[in-house]
Amino acid sequence: MTDPPRARWCESFLCRLRGLTFRPSLTRDEGLLLVFGRDSRVDSSIHMLGVKFDLAVFWINNNLQVVDKVVARAGKPAYMSKEPARYVLEVHASRIEDLAIGQTIHFQNA
């Protein structure tokens, strides 16, 4: 990503459950990083209930490698990664080409 988004760290169950639900919009420089205890397909699945806009979603494993990505549509109820992931990065839909499957990333505390 050339201009990385400022993603909010979201580790608690309630934070992950709520996600971006009921937000009116998301700017290109905002995001949410859902953090789970281990790599898992089931645990890292997401829902789009109450989300009013499309998202670029990246699933990232414990080795910080992107293992799947999708444009999540506001009208579809749920998405699951094809591979186990520990992190789910939700950002503006226009950023779907910012990361490639297989790419290794790093998190920066700002």
PLM features: what roles do these ranges have?
Residues 1-110:
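Compact, glycine-rich, soluble single-domain proteins
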